[in-house]
UniProtKB/Swiss-Prot annotation:
The gene is rnc. GO terms for biological process: mRNA processing; regulation of gene expression; rRNA processing; tRNA processing. The keyword Cytoplasm applies. This is Ribonuclease 3. SUPFAM superfamilies: dsRNA-binding domain-like, RNase III domain-like. Residues 153-223 form the DRBM domain. It comes from Mannheimia succiniciproducens (strain KCTC 0769BP / MBEL55E).
Length: 224
């Protein structure tokens, strides 16, 4: 159990029921009792926690500015950064196929795991505890975030960049949908006519998958 003791120190929370943490770390490819329900719960808690923090931190910002900052803080790449800080990839339980394809490094899987841990903390202790721990994780990010252009989501930023350069807009096509209706994984293929490449995004919703693909294109174009 030493490895989970180490993880609990990294996330600044000690579980009373360690099975909740184990479930939060279990991808659906590894077991029938996986982390997707916990992820659903954690996603809602995370969005509320960050929205509440931003509301009080920026009393003069309008709804649009607050929404963009929240989107930046709860999006997949940001959650994946937290996951890497906790080294979650070393603790996750993945099926053979996901392990072989490097699932422990995939941003979508890492981000989902962070949300699942938030959900697990709320069940193990309370909603208040989950909120407090989440705010602790986000302390530096909340301190550094500012209203501004870079808070727009990846799809919006990509569209504005292409329009500004009079380039054709991207197309997003669903290439694959896996899982039951309540816990699906979407694979989106994004093509920009002026780029000789196709980009793939994966997410727990079509929107998340499209945003992930757009983020890859922005990175390839070196657009911050």
């Amino acid at each position: 159990m030493n490895h989970l003791d180490r993880l609990q120190r990294q996330i600044s929370y000690e579980f009373k029921d360690i099975t909740l943490l184990k479930q939060a770390l279990t991808h659906r490819s590894a077991a029938t009792k996986h982390n997707e329900r916990l992820e659903f719960l954690g996603d809602a808690i995370l969005n509320y926690t960050i929205a509440d923090a931003l509301y009080h931190q920026f009393p003069k910002c309008n709804e649009g500015e607050l929404s963009r900052m929240r989107a930046t803080l709860v999006r997949e790449p940001t959650l994946a950064i937290l996951a890497r800080q906790f080294k979650l990839g070393e603790y996750m339980a993945l099926g053979h196929g996901e392990l072989k394809s490097g699932g422990f490094r995939r941003e979508s899987i890492l981000a989902d795991c962070v949300e699942a841990i938030i959900g697990a903390i709320s069940l193990d202790s309370s909603l208040v505890s989950a909120t407090q721990i989440t705010l602790h994780w986000y302390e530096k990010l909340l301190r550094e975030i500012k209203p501004g252009e870079n808070q727009k989501d990846p799809k919006t930023r990509l569209q504005e960049y292409l329009q500004g350069h009079r380039l054709a807009l991207p197309t997003y096509d669903v290439k694959d949908i896996k899982g039951e209706a309540h816990c699906q994984t979407f694979t989106i293929e994004c093509h920009v006519p002026n780029l000789d490449r196709t980009f793939i995004g994966v997410g727990s919703s079509r929107r998340k998958a499209e945003q992930a693909a757009a983020e890859q294109i922005l990175t390839a174009l070196e657009i911050k």
